Amino acid sequence: MMKRVLIKPLEPLMFRSQGEFEPLITGSHTAAQSLIIPRPSTIAGMLGYILFNKSSGTGDWLSDLTNLLDTIYGTFIETNGEYLFPLRMGNHLALVDQQHLINLPILLEKEYEQREKGIYELFYDKNKLFQIINHQDRIGISIDKSTRTVKEHYLYSARYLAFKKEVNYVIFIDNDAISDKINGKIVNFGGENRIAKLEVDDYKVDTSIEEEYYLTLSPILIPDEALDDLLDNISDYVTMGKVDKISLGFDIANTKRKEMLTAILEGSIVKRSIIDFIKKEINNNLLDRFTKYEKIGYNTLMNLCKLAFRKILS
């Protein structure tokens, strides 16, 4: 029996991606737009903040989190008792229910025209993203008192994530010990000190599946040494989705950026061969760190036909 954690937003949210505050960004105006699905480091950091004991800190953000948390699986959305899962085609993101994911393995084996028609219907007819997701735009400035003008680099616009319906983010954890410590907590969630409430309950779910195709519920991290091989043979591993560079966030305790890695983004459809590929490419020097990434939520694969998960390295 696992623990299901519902993260219930209490106000509009901001889940930053890389981009708006990168070293190469210059000019008088910076802008941020929230992700729809928070990245694993955001959720693990939120849980770690509740559980953190200063005396147990190691100075390494990843080790500190994995010492506090057991394996996290996720993330997807629940609204009105229905689960919605991310599905990605390039820059396009949809939220679809499992009833329509079930048809994907058959659809992916069809001829090109039939396959494209079926995928089009998923993204434009079956997509529930716009039924539940809204946005809230805000602008912030800083005034130079001496000139009464906006300071350079301090004109800031942000598009927050808002909701048309009651929405919960869903993750699963396999640790009974921490569930009582987090259940009912009001926590900061994402950027800009947004808040959410946590609710925990028991849930039976399989975490040892073998399938031909998987949905990625969180980014699948790729070591730099394997990137050329992956991109040269991308159709062997990724059926639809997107590969991109992502930031693992900001290390507040040490006031520095966390690492940036290449990833197959959440919502992608990958083949079983990606599992053997990553296992082969992660050498002994990388294994410990990439296993820790996996523990805090990265590399979550889901069965397309039922609510069942697996990781890649463990």
Swiss-Prot record:
Q: Which GO terms describe its biological process?
A: defense response to virus
Q: Which Gene3D superfamilies match?
A: 3.30.70.2940
Asked whether the UniProt record includes Metal-binding among its keywords, one would answer no
CDD domains hit by this protein? Cmr3_III-B
Isomerase among keywords: no
What GO cellular-component annotations does this UniProt entry give?
cytoplasm
Localization (cell): Cytoplasm
Q: Which UniProt keywords apply?
A: Antiviral defense, Cytoplasm
Q: Specify the superkingdom.
A: Archaea
Kindly list any coiled-coil regions of this protein: none
Q: Which family does it belong to?
A: Belongs to the CRISPR system Cmr3 family.
| Function summary | CRISPR (clustered regularly interspaced short palindromic repeat) is an adaptive immune system that provides protection against mobile genetic elements (viruses, transposable elements and conjugative plasmids). CRISPR clusters contain spacers, sequences complementary to antecedent mobile elements, and target invading nucleic acids. CRISPR clusters are transcribed and processed into CRISPR RNA (crRNA). The CMR complex degrades RNA complementary to the crRNA (target RNA) within UA dinucleotides, generating 3'-OH and 5'-phosphate ends.
Query: Subunit notes for this chain?
Result: Part of the CMR ribonucleoprotein complex, consisting of crRNA plus Cmr1/Cmr2/Cmr3/Cmr4/Cmr5/Cmr6 at 1:1 and possibly 3 Cmr7 dimers. A Cmr2/Cmr3/Cmr7 subcomplex without crRNA can also be isolated. It does not cleave target RNA.
Name under which the protein is recorded? CRISPR system CMR subunit Cmr3
Q: Which organism is it from?
A: Saccharolobus solfataricus (strain ATCC 35092 / DSM 1617 / JCM 11322 / P2) (Sulfolobus solfataricus)
What gene is behind this protein?
Answer: cmr3
